[in-house]
Amino acid sequence: WKKINTPWGKPSDEILIANVGKEEICFIPRHARGHKINPTNINFRANIDAMKQLDVTDIVSVSAVGSLKENLEPGKFIIADQFIDRTFSRIKTFFDEEIVAHVSMTKPTSPGLSNCCEAALKKLNIKNQKGGTYVVMEGPQFSTLAESRLYRSWKADVIGMTNMPEAKLAREAE
């Protein structure tokens, strides 16, 4: 475990650095070890900056989500390629003081990395769906039935609380 200091404050936790095969990986428990930080209070800027300081070039973000579609049974991995950001209390950019930048989020995920994830899941015989829309809600409460119906009408696949602004900040940090 390695402690990283950032100009954005403390990351959620220390970073676990390990070797998996020939690759070095870095893992940060975004809710902290022991699941102590609620989704709204995660310091996403510090987490992404810590990864940048460690020269991380690719991020695979794993999240617990709920299904909005009957055909997405529990245990099936969704390799999301789109997000609907319904968060409202989180800092969503590195560019809020002294400099403004406009970063495209048209394609918020890497097709190459998505292909790698799909191949790894298939190799492990884990059910998966490549492509899907992830609604990110503020939390920590779950959505109302009316909200879930709305998101289904938008053709969203899954709902969770943690991938925004994480994906936006990762794109800005590229």
Language-model segment annotations:
Residues 163-169:
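A structural signal for small-residue-enriched, beta-sheet-centric alpha/beta enzyme cores
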Residues 1-105:
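Metabolite-binding pocket within alpha/beta catalytic cores that recognizes anionic/polar moieties
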Residues 112, 116-127:
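Generic non-transmembrane alpha-helical segments
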Residues 52-55, 152, 171:
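Non-catalytic positions within long, well-ordered alpha-helices that form the structural scaffold/packing
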